[in-house]
Amino acid sequence: MTTIKTSNLGFPRLGRTREWKKAIESYWAKKISKEELDQTLTDLHKENLLLQKYYHLDSIPVGDFSLYDHILDTSLLFNIIPERFQGRTIDDDLLFDIARGNKDHVASALIKWFNTNYHYIVPEWDNVEPKVSRNVLLDRFKYAQSLNVNAHPVIVGPITFVKLSKGGHQTFEEKVKTLLPLYKEVFESLIDAGAEYIQVDEPILVTDDSESYENITREAYDYFEKAGVAKKLVIQTYFERAHLKFLSSLPVGGLGLDFVHDNGYNLKQIEAGDFDKSKTLYAGIIDGRNVWASDIEAKKVLIDKLLAHTNELVIQPSSSLLHVPVSLDDETLDTSVGEGLSFATEKLDELDALRRLLNQNDSVKYDKLKARYERFQNQSFKNLDYDFESVRTSRQSPFAQRIEQQQKRLNLPDLPTTTIGSFPQSREVRKYRADWKNKRITDEAYETFLKNEIARWIKIQEDIGLDVLVHGEFERNDMVEFFGEKLQGFLVTKFGWVQSYGSRAVKPPIIYGDVKWTAPLTVDETVYAQSLTDKPVKGMLTGPVTILNWSFERVDLPRKVVQDQIALAINEEVLALEAAGIKVIQVDEPALREGLPLRSEYHEQYLKDAVLSFKLATSSVRDETQIHTHMCYSQFGQIIHAIHDLDADVISIETSRSHGDLIKDFEDINYDLGIGLGVYDIHSPRIPTKEEITTAINRSLQQIDRSLFWVNPDCGLKTRKEEEVKDALTVLVNAVKAKRQE
């Protein structure tokens, strides 16, 4: 009988109570020393390693832990340093500056990691001299060994790393070949240090165009075979199905496949005999991206099927557990829903239950998890009926007619200025909200504070000279969690944090039941803000696609049904804002692109559903009401027509870190709706110059009709300091005023 082994691809960095985030931000704020930061993070890394050891994993990942981002770690490992940051010592301070920018230089681009809500720092190849320069991976592997942890190093593979990079004069293939000797050097150092195998993450090999670079992939791994290291390599793929016959032909020791998000294709390939039995199969059977407990009995059935076609089997999560919270231990959840949940720690417990059952015939833990899952499944969370057909899915009039009525009503100047929505969440704001939630202050005291903060920022915006204002969202902890707290069908946790980018953590709500709007969500704050000014104040909402993509979704209904339920709820709030006299309503969809399936065969339906849901949420308003939306930067070329089909009167897009790349996406489309391309990077504390903003405006106007163009920051300003926001917006408005005189 084959012995089943267990492993993991990666563990959350944040810590149970976001210790990682707090330590790093304290260091940035100069509240703790570098030595204190190092000690805190070392302690957290140790805790993560020993926790995984407690659940009897046969091999534990090292290299998943990072001070910011594992792709940026790889860039520094190979001396792929942006040209503007070259010449400095390669250390943690350089890492932070590349990621965040500084007073002299802009940060590197920040892009979604495949179709997740994690973001990576894009490697830049302009004028670089690749070499092994900072082997932190080796240091962390040796540290794990010192703890008597059976660890395996983790590194993003050469094909994926280069494919996610930008810049440089070399071709894709030339860049890969440049890195191969460096990867070999790193692999040899790890093997010499005692690594039994090395996890090489190549998720790019599950994407549509992977077949177009199969030749360079084969050349790369043949190179490693000739170097004598290939048999120690395990290629891990995740998020979709892989081309198994090709992967099996590579001279590596093992292959990792996703058996959760592959739509059943990977098992079909296994059963068709496409897997080379001389290799070890690393089977991703536990969902690494959602928080629902596994159907443990179904997982056992899957394992039995895989055992019939493999000689060595390791079971693992479908992807790194970076995408889920750390533990349920500190949560106080209603049992009816709580029994159906599984965070990172509980997923390790599921693996351990299967290992015990299959290797030791010990069914105690397995039976407990099976009974718990069955109790959850026996409940019904499908209780509501919906009338989707009675709600409009297109505006009353075309944009050309609407914009005339809107401009007459709003009377906006040339190149109107606005912000994306949120203003700084100061320590005082967070304290008041926490005190209110914990009932340490009265509703009246909290409402008074919010009104004072709204009034203060309305005046700040008027003094700066912005044209369309916002109330600042001080009552909101997160643009999705806020709606999760107020809409029926959502569950919000206390400690369910996950990393989005750098030290930015979000707490996705959990959709467990039918979604319904029961009362106004944002009307009071928005109407109050509008009462303080003659300038228009935007109502600020999050769109249905983003709410779904940034939540942990229920799995007992099709995505489209849940998405449309959310759209109906948002439509109710849009109409409530309009009825209250709000003239401009923004429905943000920053996550529309990130949810795009990795395989193009699913793109058309996804985009069709997304557009319909957005229009379901926004089309019932009158022509004179202006609908805005906002999206975060990504590769928009694939969805540019869908963006147009949303029929939003104005869209603002995060673009500054793309350094002009995004504008190319508008060359092939006559974009005839209002648009604002973000003119400065809000993810960096750096204040833009007037010249930089003017350059960004001029570059945008080469492709976009001036009468349709808006000027705005990249994104919401929640994470910035007040003085940074004031200074940056003042520069923005002054640049626009000068441009209006030309």
Swiss-Prot record:
Catalytic activity, reaction form: 5-methyltetrahydropteroyltri-L-glutamate + L-homocysteine = tetrahydropteroyltri-L-glutamate + L-methionine
Entry binding sites for 5-methyltetrahydropteroyltri-L-glutamate: 18-21, 112, 550, 594
Cofactor: Zn(2+)
Keyword Nucleotide-binding among record annotations: no
EC identifiers of the protein: 2.1.1.14
Any one GO MF annotation of this record: 5-methyltetrahydropteroyltriglutamate-homocysteine S-methyltransferase activity
Cofactor note: Binds 1 zinc ion per subunit.
Residues binding Zn(2+): 630, 632, 654, 715
Pathway terms, separated by semicolons: Amino-acid biosynthesis; L-methionine biosynthesis via de novo pathway; L-methionine from L-homocysteine (MetE route): step 1/1
Keywords annotated in UniProt: Amino-acid biosynthesis, Metal-binding, Methionine biosynthesis, Methyltransferase, Repeat, Transferase, Zinc
Binding site residues for L-homocysteine: 420-422, 473, 588
Residue numbers annotated as active site: 683
Family: Belongs to the vitamin-B12 independent methionine synthase family.
Function: Catalyzes the transfer of a methyl group from 5-methyltetrahydrofolate to homocysteine resulting in methionine formation.
Name used for this protein in its record: 5-methyltetrahydropteroyltriglutamate--homocysteine methyltransferase
Organism whose genome encodes this protein: Staphylococcus aureus (strain JH9)
Lineage: Bacteria, Bacillati, Bacillota, Bacilli, Bacillales
Gene name of the encoded protein: metE
